[in-house]
Amino acid sequence: RNEEERLINHLFKERGYNKELRPAQT
């Protein structure tokens, strides 16, 4: 489901992290 992706995206937006700069640990 997109629960994990949703949480990760929320954290990225809050922290201002970019997938390129900080790849999420899958």
Swiss-Prot record:
After binding acetylcholine, the AChR responds by an extensive change in conformation that affects all subunits and leads to opening of an ion-conducting channel across the plasma membrane. It catalyses: K(+)(in) = K(+)(out); Na(+)(in) = Na(+)(out). This is Acetylcholine receptor subunit delta. Pentamer of two alpha chains, and one each of the beta, delta, and gamma chains. Belongs to the ligand-gated ion channel (TC 1.A.9) family. Acetylcholine receptor (TC 1.A.9.1) subfamily. It comes from the Eukaryota. GO terms for biological process: monoatomic ion transmembrane transport. It is found in: Postsynaptic cell membrane; Cell membrane. Its main location: membrane. Keywords: Cell membrane, Ion channel, Ion transport, Ligand-gated ion channel, Membrane, Postsynaptic cell membrane, Receptor, Synapse, Transmembrane, Transport. It is a multi-pass membrane protein. GO terms for cellular component: postsynaptic membrane.
